[in-house]
Amino acid sequence: MGKKYTESVKLVDKNTLYTVQEAIELVTKTSKAKFDETVELAVRLGVDPRHADQQVRGAVVLPHGTGKTVRVLVFAKGDKVNEAQEAGADFVGAEELVEKIQKENWFDFDVVVATPDMMGVVGRLGRVLGPKGLMPNPKSGTVTFDVAKAIADIKAGKVEYRVDKTAIIHVPIGKSSFGEEKLSDNFHVLMEAVVKAKPAAAKGQYIKSVAISSTMGPGIKINPGKVLE
C-alpha cells in the first residue's frame, strides 16, 4: 500500500457510519492521487436479483454530470442518422458498425443508443454488448426514436444504475475536484432515484448499506437510514 493511501485510511474510521455530508467531506480529503479521482457510490440493496420482480435498474441525469467525457454510439437509419449526428453522437451507423464490432473487437464508445427498428440488428451483438453493460435498453432510455434527447441526456451526465448479482449498485457521482456541494447534489439525486425504484416485491430493509470512495481512496460508510437527509 502506498504512503498516501495509508494516510487516507487514518482519516476514516471503518466502524463509523457517517452522515452524507461528513462522508463527502472525507472523500474529498482522502482523494490524494495526482489525477482527478472519480468518486463512486456503492449501495447494497435488500433485494434478490435472481428474481425478475426484484431487479433494480434505471437512469438519472446528475445535476453536475460525472466529469467524464462520454462517447455515444447510435444505431439508426434514415432521418435519424442526421438527427443523431446533429445532436452530437460520436458514431452513427447500422450494419457496418455491427460488423466493425464483431470483426475488429471495436469498443471505442461508452454508451449505445438504438432506435427500436434497429434492435433486430443490434440484437446480434447481445453476447458482446451484454456482459459489458452496453446493450441498449428501453428502461434506461437508450432504445428510443427520440435520439436527440437520449444523446443530450447522456452528454449532460446521465448515469445508468443496475443492481448486480450481489445486490449492489455501483455508480460514479462525479470527480473529487467537484467539491462537496456538487458531489452532495449528485449523491442525493441518485439516491432518490434508487429509493423510488424499489420493487414492490422487495421485503424488509431496502437500503442495506451505503459507501462512497474515490478511485484510490478507502471506502467511507454512510448511515443507510440518513441517505435522504
UniProtKB/Swiss-Prot annotation:
GO terms for biological process: regulation of translation; translation. CDD domains: Ribosomal_L1. SUPFAM superfamilies: Ribosomal protein L1 (SSF56808). Pfam families: Ribosomal_L1. One of its GO terms (molecular function) is tRNA binding. It comes from the Bacteria. Binds directly to 23S rRNA. The L1 stalk is quite mobile in the ribosome, and is involved in E site tRNA release. Protein L1 is also a translational repressor protein, it controls the translation of the L11 operon by binding to its mRNA. Belongs to the universal ribosomal protein uL1 family. This is Large ribosomal subunit protein uL1. It comes from Clostridium botulinum (strain Hall / ATCC 3502 / NCTC 13319 / Type A). The gene is rplA.
